[in-house]
Amino acid sequence: MKLLALLSLLILMLQEARTASLSEEREGDPYAILHLGDYVLSLDNYDEVIDPSNYDELIDYGDQLPQVKGTSLASLTRTRFTQSTEAARTLPSNPTTARPPTLGLLAAPANHGLPTCLICVCLGSSVYCDDADLENIPPLPQTTAYLYARFNRISHIRAGDFKGLTKLKRIDLSGNSISSIDDKALRLLPALRDLILPENKLVALPTLPTSIEVLDVRMNRLQSSGIQPEAFRALEKLQFLYLADNLLDAIPPSLPLSLRSLHLQNNMIETMQRDAFCDAEEHRHTRRPLEDIRLDGNPINLSLFPSAYFCLPRLPTGRFV
């Protein structure tokens, strides 16, 4: 009986020793109890999108979720997500934007919806819009003094195209298709000196500002009926008048004494008034500034009208036989 008790005690001691040995082995190797065979990775549903609104249904937290004033964390998360979703749905489909800043020197948008100084080249007080496929005069900066918009498709100059441009000195619209100019488009430009409009389709001249010094309307379709009888009388600063290659049948009357150069070649002029250039009653008067008159390319015979140009320092260029 004592032997049986001794054997039982020995077996119990061996089991205790074995258990202690296993515990020490597991504490030395934390991965000893990790069996990778128990973990299976499935790629079939790897790209499945998890909806956060029912996230607490996918994972059962049980009693582990903390309570926030009687509301579970999962419920609170779902509530906030729902509120943010509803807020996103109520955003306006066409949100309003703030008014863009004023363009200043860039000027307002032109034909292409861009500011003028992005379509044209603005250098100081000069604006260059040559060959820019423009159909109208673009809005210009208020400081513009020189405008070059040559070789475009401009067909009409409107009354307000140059409104407020009190510093504008030169307009060059050569090589467009301008057929008409509103009468008020130019006359209110106090600083305008040079108006350059050759190679257009003008049939008449508008009222011009008294500040004009150079007027170039060569190669248009101007007729004598399209020039008012007193069109040039008040232009006391006009020095250069170029009317060549038009459809004129008479020399414009009332030319100012300031005129230095008059080009009328290649028109349809057949006759000349006695007072076209000189005062028939004042034989001692000499019109010295007017030294350059061209009438070549016209059917007129200048030798038939000597009294019309006796006061000139030089004979006009043209046919005398």
UniProtKB/Swiss-Prot annotation:
It comes from the Eukaryota. Residues 1-19 form the signal peptide. Residues 105-142 form the LRRNT domain. Pfam families: LRR_8. Keywords: Disulfide bond, Extracellular matrix, Glycoprotein, Leucine-rich repeat, Repeat, Secreted, Signal, Sulfation. The modification Sulfotyrosine is found at Y61. It is found in: Secreted, Extracellular space, Extracellular matrix. Glycans are attached at N301. Disulfide bonds join C278-C311. One of its GO terms (cellular component) is extracellular matrix. InterPro entries: Leu-rich_rpt, Leu-rich_rpt_typical-subtyp, LRR_dom_sf, Mimecan/Epiphycan/Opticin. The keyword Membrane does not apply. GO terms for biological process: angiogenesis; articular cartilage development; bone development; collagen fibril organization; negative regulation of angiogenesis. SUPFAM superfamilies: L domain-like. LRR repeats lie at residues 143-164, 167-188, 191-212, 237-258, 259-279, 289-309. The record marks A20, S21, G104, L105, P109, A110 as: Cleavage. O-glycosylated (sialylated oligosaccharides). Sulfated on tyrosine residues. Belongs to the small leucine-rich proteoglycan (SLRP) family. SLRP class III subfamily. Inhibits angiogenesis in the vitreous humor of the eye, and therefore represses neovascularization. Binds collagen fibrils. May be involved in collagen fiber organization via regulation of other members of the small leucine-rich repeat proteoglycan superfamily. Homodimer. This is Opticin. The lineage of its organism: Eukaryota, Metazoa, Chordata, Craniata, Vertebrata.
